């Protein structure tokens, strides 16, 4: 196989309810590119990759997911322009299951790789969860209590 690249599943503790599904010739380079942004509190992590022979094979996967449930994809409008993103409201396990099914059906499960988090990445995931819990306890719960007590 003359490998062209991979379809990847990326996660980010900053928004754990989404995964990013895309294509890259070199997933480590793509990861560095995404993580150069100062706009996201935590870095992206590679959850899984699937080796493909054709570039932009992820577009076919995006189309499949959109057909199954068009509400999963992150789509918004900024300055009158529609932005269709590679982010999907699903768990990393659900995204992996889709890739795994495709790999099995194609007889290419050996091209599928589940990546391990480093200890530092695990700590970041835990920290992000703690921050989310603290935000919920400090802001959301008191706000809901206040709303309920309002005459």
Map each language-model feature to its residues.
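Non-catalytic accessory segments flanking enzymatic or RNA/DNA-binding domains
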Residues: 1-151
């Amino acid at each position: 196989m003359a490998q062209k690249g991979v379809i990847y599943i990326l996660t980010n503790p900053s928004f754990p309810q989404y995964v990013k599904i895309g294509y890259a010739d070199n997933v480590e380079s793509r990861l560095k590119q995404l993580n150069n942004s100062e706009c996201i509190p935590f870095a992206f992590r590679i959850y899984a990759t699937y080796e493909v022979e054709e570039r932009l094979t992820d577009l076919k996967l995006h189309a499949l997911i959109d057909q199954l449930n068009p509400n999963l994809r992150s789509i918004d409008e900024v300055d009158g322009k529609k932005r269709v993103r590679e982010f999907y409201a699903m768990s990393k396990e659900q995204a992996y299951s889709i890739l795994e099914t495709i790999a099995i059906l194609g007889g290419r499960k050996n091209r599928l790789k589940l990546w391990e988090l480093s200890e530092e990445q695990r700590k970041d995931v835990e920290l992000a969860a703690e921050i989310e819990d603290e935000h919920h306890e400090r802001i959301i719960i008191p706000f809901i209590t206040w709303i309920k007590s309002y005459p």
